[in-house]
Amino acid sequence: MNKIVVNNANLRKLMEGNKRYMASHLIHPDQSSERRFELKHGQHPFAIILGCSDSRVPPEVIFDQGLGDLYVVRVVGNVLDQMIVASIEYAVLHLDVRLIMVMGHSQCGAVQATCNHNQLEGHLPSLTFALNAALNKAKDLPGDLTENVILANVGLVSEELKQTGAHFPEMMKKGELVIVPAYYHIDTGKVELLT
Ligand SMILES: [Zn+2]
């Protein structure tokens, strides 16, 4: 993973922003009216973040980025479905974004709810369905079940994206696309890259 960090300028830019955030040395880049004006002709974000809808994990804040920098897809439990894959494919294939980060986080309430086997209301059983593979992978592991499911889900979602995104396998083979699993620690603000 260190090799990717060293060689990937976009990932380095993300992680440097996260370091500033952790140290409370935010520079709030690209948030001026000039930047807004500059973007009226189009967007060229340098990274895609697939993250959870949790109010404590807003990518622009935790990576200290601004307008037009990040293409963000947020959904409870950072799971995948067809529209989410389509959203990511749009950014890769039409906006030429070459880095995808799949970011889970500590204390994910959505995963917790699924692990507790609560009778879930409304459309929430579809979340359980989306997390089922991670739940199966993690259920016999030692340690905290919720944390294990969060980690398993990030890995499985990254793998699924690698395999199912249109043109993603060949792009990755040619080094034109990088998909990075990551885990955000709510208490410290650190984004940890997972291998
Ligand atoms: Zn969450």
Task: Set out the residue ranges of the language-model regions.
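Conserved functional hotspot residues or short segments at active or partner-binding sites
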Residues: 102
